[in-house]
Amino acid sequence: MDIVGGQNLRQMWDDLAGVYGDKTALIFESCEGIVRQFSYASINEEINRTANLFYSLGIRKGDRVALHLDNCPEFIFCWFGLAKIGAIMVPINARLLGEESAWILQNSQVSLLVTSAQFYPMYREIRQDNSTPLNHICLIGEQLPADDGVSHFSQLQARQSATLCYTPALSTDDTAEILFTSGTTSRPKGVVITHYNLRFAGYYSAWQIALRDDDVYMTVMPAFHIDCQCTAAMPAFSAGSTFVLLEKYSARAFWDQVRKYQATVTECIPMMIRTLMVQPAAPTDRQHHLREVMFYLNLSAQEKDAFTERFGVRLLTSYGMTETIVGIIGDRPGDKRRWPSIGRVGFSYEAEIRDDQNRPLPAGEIGEICIKGIPGKTIFKEYYMQPEATARALEPEGWLHTGDSGYQDEDGYFYFVDRRCNMIKRGGENVSCVELENIISAHPKIQDIVVVGIKDAIRDEAIKAFIVLNEGETLSEAEFFSFCENNMAKFKVPSFMEIRTDLPRNCSGKIIKKNLK
């Protein structure tokens, strides 16, 4: 079943502008509380002007342009402006430093960058090193340095027509984006995403949360991340909903923003759930319009129940990764939810559990979660310029090896166990980091927890726990180890513990374990 019907992103926006016109498409709120709002018709004009801006700078179909931006409307304009002329967006994680950013520029052969003033000093150094093909920077902001090869985004865009001046032939198979994975354990890989991928993501995720044109979808997820793009922005726009994009996450402001914009759907990661729960309880906690909170791994049953009870809104679990584009396994609209299951496989996909010899496993047995989709349509097309890595992850028949461990029950519900690289081998036993983290997080004094494996001459690996305590709490080693011994098998009890003020995280809130070993 082809639900995209050959429609590329240029056609999508022209159609949306015609159908929804003056209806609000995008609301953006900055950290300072400044609000900018765009209708479907006006945002399409902004996108067209931005497309013409890129054309005026020499960008043509197939060229790659990098974006290094925090959340802002200009990210949306650039994303779809590039797509309208067949060019390719290369979003860069806004937290990356110079060497990491330069590596992405070099490996994607980017000559033009759009960024903001706060990141400009880093890129000025990169250009001076001559280590990348970068030769022009388009800056967003009020200040414009008097440097060669630098232009001002707002000034250039304001000069452009709202009618496209360059309309090359487009296909849904054309690449729209190269999104580099977070690379917490090695160099990031460029995930190639097509026009079809993004259109499909919009329809699929809108189905998953039963999104309608009277919904308001609010997100704080970074726009350079797959979650914001394919489980928030694309479904919101595809359904004709209103998309609310916040510049940054604030636990203190979050519920006020939900109420202010009358959001009906939002998305959260575990870090957000936990920080929202430590805010002082208020009589207004349940006074909102949210009907769904899209949720991504991992959370203990105690944390899930406490959140649902306090705020009166359920979590809709969705499992996926950059390569799957969307949450290919998850809760379904109107279907039973079986916590801690991650749900059932969505339409257009197949899923099964396989052993180390790549053979399907029966219900109840733990193995690798494998997903079948159509490359370039329902799953990513390939890793950019890395055919060997593509071949390792993606079988010719469309089966994707996720690298995650899980199992399936007799009713077709899937259960996530751990990232396969997140298993600790201890004295012949496989220990799931997630299992231990869920158990330990139930301790009333602990706010955040991560466990890692460290080398052990006798038992392969020993287990070390890094802990962040709730404000004002103290925790002795004796108290910690006693709690563990009472709540888990002896071979799972950590050998070491370390208390920290915070844990290192990447842009999507995932803990960077390599920084803890």
Swiss-Prot record:
Its EC number is 6.2.1.48. GO terms for molecular function: carnitine-CoA ligase activity; crotonobetaine-CoA ligase activity; medium-chain fatty acid-CoA ligase activity. It comes from the Bacteria. Pathway: Amine and polyamine metabolism; carnitine metabolism. The keyword Transferase does not apply. Pfam families: AMP-binding (PF00501), AMP-binding_C (PF13193). It catalyses: 4-(trimethylamino)butanoate + ATP + CoA = 4-(trimethylamino)butanoyl-CoA + AMP + diphosphate; crotonobetaine + ATP + CoA = crotonobetainyl-CoA + AMP + diphosphate; (R)-carnitine + ATP + CoA = (R)-carnitinyl-CoA + AMP + diphosphate. One of its GO terms (biological process) is fatty acid metabolic process. It is an enzyme of class 6 (ligase). Keywords: Ligase. Belongs to the ATP-dependent AMP-binding enzyme family. NCBIfam families: PRK08008.1. Catalyzes the transfer of CoA to carnitine, generating the initial carnitinyl-CoA needed for the CaiB reaction cycle. Also has activity toward crotonobetaine and gamma-butyrobetaine. This is Crotonobetaine/carnitine--CoA ligase. It comes from Salmonella newport (strain SL254). The gene is caiC.
